[in-house]
Amino acid sequence: DIPLFEKVFFRNLVSLVIAFYLIKKSSAPVFGQRKNQLALLARAGFGLAGVILNFYAISHLTLADSTMLGKLSPIFVTIMACLFLKEKIDKEQIIGIFITFGGALLVIKPEFSLSIIPSIAGLLSAAAAGIAYTLLRYLKDKESPDTIVFYFSIVSVLETLPFVLNDYIVPDSTQLMLLLATGLFASVGQFGITYAYKYSKATEVSIYNYSAIVFGIILGFIFFHEIPDMLSLLG
């Protein structure tokens, strides 16, 4: 019952508060250095575009198909890191990416009932995420991870605010709790991935994106009693 942009707004509002607190505690620059503004803005813009396009794809495709398209982002990260960050990738890493993508397909089991516009949105979402993650790696020694998360969060909050004001639904206590919980767990993920790209190569970190599928299976079993089939276990 909660509109899309309201969910995105709350998700990033929680991250904004946490990042601001950490910045004040560490005395890191709130908006970063002037010379890095373009990279920070680009990272925030591509990150937000990836989220919105992903939500659009999910709304118009089967969940399996939209998830499959989203899992192409590590491939985009690898390509862009090689081209723009001059990171080297060996044959084993390339094989590893395609093996894990194949395993993801076994778990997701896409139906390939793809409509053209939502499919393009899903593909662009993966590309936007790939660019955003590559920019995270570029900023690794230039800005604090707290500053990067704050910048992304405040841009996302400001960009989604007009849509929220236009179509705001007052959440009940349960919905508010779920929105805040979503924001909290998303914040943990956002800080985790930002620190990961700070300390390791983009080509090495990106493949761990597929671990979300494993956690999804485990959580689905614990909370919703979903039993994975043989293909999912094989994947």
Please provide the spans of the model-predicted regions.
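Transmembrane alpha-helical segments that form core, pore/gating elements
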Residues: 1-4, 19, 112-169
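C-terminal-most transmembrane helix of multi-pass membrane proteins
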Residues: 214-235
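Membrane-interface interhelical linkers
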Residues: 16-42, 91, 141-143, 154, ...
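Cytoplasmic-side transmembrane-helix entry/capping segments in multi-pass membrane proteins
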Residues: 34-45, 89-101, 118-123, 142-154, ...
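Hydrophobic/small/kink-forming positions within alpha-helical transmembrane segments
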Residues: 20, 44-52, 74-79, 104, ...
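Helix-helix packing/entry segments at the starts of transmembrane helices
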Residues: 10, 67-72, 139, 143-155, ...
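Hydrophobic transmembrane alpha-helices of multi-pass small-molecule transport proteins
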Residues: 92-108, 231-235
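Structural signature of hydrophobic alpha-helical transmembrane segments
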Residues: 3-15, 56-73, 115-128, 172-186, ...
